[in-house]
Amino acid sequence: MGFTSAWAVTAHPDDVMADVRPHVLPRIERHRQFPETRRAWRAWCADPLPDHRDWDALRQLPGKHEAITSFLRLTSMIPLDELHCSGDRGVHLYDLWEGADDAVRPYLGFYRKDYAVSALFHAIGPERAALLPGWCGDFALTAEEVRRSLPAVEEALGFTPVERVAAEERIWLDDLPDDEPVLDGPLRCWREAADTGLGLLGVNVHLY
């Protein structure tokens, strides 16, 4: 059965984030603390996966099929889906996306039968991924938290020319010509939000 996922990074003033955070942060933290989630994260950190183009052959080796499946589940399990699917939770994602502050152009990654966060984390590896606030693409940050976290995000998503080529080779997403690359969009949002004094909301959800 097909699906379409979205990873959206949108900017909002602190008064909006104050309303959003009580709905978002507990769900993120609860998911982060699941034993299955922690085991999958530790396994990926201990043994990062090789180039995705080798996965078909790798799946034939003992334990490797499980390692690939574990990583994909880790980066595609979506605790905030209920905020998108239900209108009686005190916050609705479509309303937040439509009401994002115009000072920062949102990053919107829409993919059919795929996940932007999975591809990004595979491209940058666990050491860089661990520098990103929140959990696997989900976060709700005040303006001050955006400013404080910017150096870590710069370290996670900033690349030398050689590093950029290597990261691009590990991205498996099929972008359209007008799509902003997942290697660029989130960092741009962070920089612009830090410059304009806005908070950031990152949400990884299924659209349908």
What are these regions, as identified by a protein language model?
Residues 200-205:
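Short, well-ordered beta-strand elements
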